């Protein structure tokens, strides 16, 4: 039982003993005491004033005196208006530290075969371009959320839906046919996803030139788009693909495999993975079947041009296209099919889609359509909506070829980390292989932390220069502190200093040492809240606060030079627990920790 739970129970007992009634649910409000006051935890007394029929100050004093007499964990009280500040006895903090040290899974719940199953979908790339900065935020959020849900005792299936078909894919294919001259990734000397992305940009370049030419002849933009022969060829290629044309399908398979190979290398570098990958080319037909079933059952309507729509006006929305006039499907068709396949494949208790907030409407509609089609899981979908990410220069647009590729960004982060280490003279202390590995860990850690520390629901600007800074709220600052603690522990081991498995509980503690133990003990609740609110940012910022707390302690107190063996062992044990908590928390963010920097 945590100190918080213990004192909540004792506070409830105090209210019952003093006022003859049990407090209602939510009336016991314990919070961390503000720094300007004495104490560790503060009880809000206002809810009990009616029961006591006394002033808030008198009520707080009564409850505080009862706790002093009946709860050994409380060593002192301070009343500030309607707030009761409680000081926890040093013995209790030391007992808690022993409990945390003895529990290797502290803060994490272990799933069993009976635990609820959560599926988390993230990444969802198109096979016409490499992953970019927007995908980086998506992948990092999805992977971290999956790890956080695991730490909350859920079984988790990490899944990806690859958008490997559609008009955007045909644009790259057509451009390669027209202007590719048989080039392959090997011939070009570049990753397949980057090569295909080049052809997507090339298509757009020729398409814009064609539109400009048609508009120069007097056509409006809409008329020019309708008259475009290039776009007509792309649409015909899509029709042939859906009809199973052998040549088109063979080209599609070849070019997609180039992209898959490129994606796999990017995912590996990023440190994310998936338990199950679905492909739109396999799921859209299931979706079409469901749409046609809905049409037969009168759930959907067919317009005069042959297109199929869902009328959502009774749900406060508009009409939604499900099949185009030529019979080809849209994203919604695919998502209906994918959802059906997933719930057939796994006994899912919760389905979480990690998709940007520009798709809020899409998932609102998907939930309604699945429910209308008779799927019970329709109302249980969770859209983990996150904000857009930009660079200081502005938004990214893949059609213009100005997008920041994930590969280039990760390479730049690693290179910058290596340069900073070289300038600081750190590289000379390690061999070349270790220096490269540390640069990789620090560079990628800085990238991940900078993105994940931001509330996922907010738009953000990623500044590469700011992200690698050994001061302030950055991943490299946390990693440096971790490496320093690991160095401390190595030196302690070399000196032969022993740390007993159970620390004595009669040691004197300073306020900063108590505060540090209290901060470590909060890890479990932070992990729990991060799972409830789907927020890796809570983990990131908690770890940063823990690091600041530790650095204050390290600055003010001797560890290795402490002459009292018992106090030295305590401070080493506390340092070790802080490092372990940092590592566990960063693992939930997908960030590695370097043993040396």
UniProtKB/Swiss-Prot annotation:
One of its GO terms (molecular function) is ATP binding. Belongs to the class-I aminoacyl-tRNA synthetase family. A motif ('HIGH' region) lies at residues 125-135. Its main location: cytoplasm. Monomer. The lineage of its organism: Bacteria, Pseudomonadati, Bacteroidota, Bacteroidia, Bacteroidales. GO terms for biological process: arginyl-tRNA aminoacylation. One of its GO terms (cellular component) is cytoplasm. It comes from Porphyromonas gingivalis (strain ATCC 33277 / DSM 20709 / CIP 103683 / JCM 12257 / NCTC 11834 / 2561). It catalyses: tRNA(Arg) + L-arginine + ATP = L-arginyl-tRNA(Arg) + AMP + diphosphate. PANTHER family: ARGININE--TRNA LIGASE, CYTOPLASMIC, ARGINYL-TRNA SYNTHETASE. Keywords: Aminoacyl-tRNA synthetase, ATP-binding, Cytoplasm, Ligase, Nucleotide-binding, Protein biosynthesis. It is found in: Cytoplasm. It is an enzyme of class 6 (ligase). InterPro entries: aa-tRNA-synth_I_CS, Arg-tRNA-ligase, Arg-tRNA-synth_N, Arg-tRNA-synth_N_sf, ArgRS_core, DALR_anticod-bd, Rossmann-like_a/b/a_fold, tRNAsynth_Ia_anticodon-bd. This is Arginine--tRNA ligase. Its EC number is 6.1.1.19. PROSITE patterns: AA_TRNA_LIGASE_I.
């Amino acid at each position: 039982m945590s100190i918080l739970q213990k004192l909540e129970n004792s506070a409830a007992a105090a209210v019952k003993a003093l006022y003859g009634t049990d407090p209602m649910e939510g009336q016991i409000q314990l919070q961390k005491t503000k720094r300007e006051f004495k104490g560790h935890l503060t009880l809000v007394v206002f809810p009990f004033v009616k029961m006591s029929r006394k002033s808030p100050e008198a009520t707080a004093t009564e409850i505080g005196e009862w706790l002093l007499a009946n709860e050994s964990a409380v060593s002192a009280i301070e009343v500030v208006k309607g707030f009761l500040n409680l000081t926890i006895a040093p013995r209790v903090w030391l007992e808690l530290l022993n409990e945390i040290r003895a529990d290797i899974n502290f803060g994490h719940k272990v799933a069993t075969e009976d635990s609820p199953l959560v599926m988390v979908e993230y990444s969802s790339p198109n096979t016409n371009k490499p992953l970019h900065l927007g995908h980086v935020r998506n992948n990092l959020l999805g992977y971290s959320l999956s790890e956080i849900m695991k730490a909350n005792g859920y079984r988790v299936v990490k899944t990806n839906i690859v958008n490997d078909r559609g008009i955007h894919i045909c644009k790259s294919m057509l451009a390669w046919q027209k202007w590719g001259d048989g080039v392959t990734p090997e011939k070009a000397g570049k990753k397949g996803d980057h090569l295909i992305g080049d052809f997507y940009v090339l298509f757009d370049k020729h398409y814009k030139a064609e539109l400009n030419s048609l508009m120069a002849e007097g056509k409006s933009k809409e008329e020019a788009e309708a008259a475009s022969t290039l776009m007509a060829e792309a649409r015909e290629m899509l029709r042939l693909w859906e009809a199973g044309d052998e040549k088109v399908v063979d080209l599609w398979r070849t070019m997609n495999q180039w992209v898959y190979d490129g994606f796999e290398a990017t995912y590996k570098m990023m440190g994310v993975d998936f338990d199950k990958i679905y492909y739109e080319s396999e799921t859209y037909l299931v979706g079409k079947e469901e749409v046609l079933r809905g049409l037969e059952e009168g759930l959907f309507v067919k317009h005069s041009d042959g297109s199929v729509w869902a009328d959502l006006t009774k749900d406060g929305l508009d009409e939604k296209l499900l099949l185009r006039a030529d019979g080809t499907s849209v994203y919604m068709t695919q998502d209906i099919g994918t959802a059906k396949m997933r719930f057939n494949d796994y006994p899912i208790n919760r389905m979480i889609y990690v998709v940007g907030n520009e798709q809020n409407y899409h998932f609102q509609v998907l939930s309604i359509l699945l429910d209308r089609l008779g799927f019970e899981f329709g109302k249980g979908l969770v859209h983990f909506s996150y904000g857009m990410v930009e660079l200081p220069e502005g938004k990214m647009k893949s059609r213009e070829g100005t997008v920041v590729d994930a590969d280039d960004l990760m390479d730049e982060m690693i290179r910058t980390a290596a340069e900073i280490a070289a300038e600081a003279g750190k590289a000379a202390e390690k061999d070349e292989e270790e220096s490269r590995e540390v640069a990789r860990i620090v560079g990628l850690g800085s990238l991940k932390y900078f993105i994940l520390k931001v509330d996922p629901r907010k738009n953000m600007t990623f500044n590469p220069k700011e992200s690698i800074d050994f001061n302030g709220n950055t991943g490299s600052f946390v990693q440096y502190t971790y490496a320093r603690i690991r160095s401390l522990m190595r030196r302690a081991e070399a000196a032969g200093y022993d740390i007993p498995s159970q620390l004595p509980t009669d040691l004197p503690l300073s306020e900063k040492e108590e505060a540090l133990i209290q901060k470590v003990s909060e890890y479990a609740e932070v992990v729990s809240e991060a799972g409830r609110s789907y927020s890796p940012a809570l983990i990131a910022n908690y770890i940063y606060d823990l690091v600041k707390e530790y650095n204050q302690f390290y600055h003010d107190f001797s560890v290795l030079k402490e002459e009292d063996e018992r106090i030295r062992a305590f401070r080493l044990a506390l340092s070790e627990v802080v490092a372990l908590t940092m590592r566990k928390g960063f693992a939930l963010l997908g960030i590695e920790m370097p043993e040396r920097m």
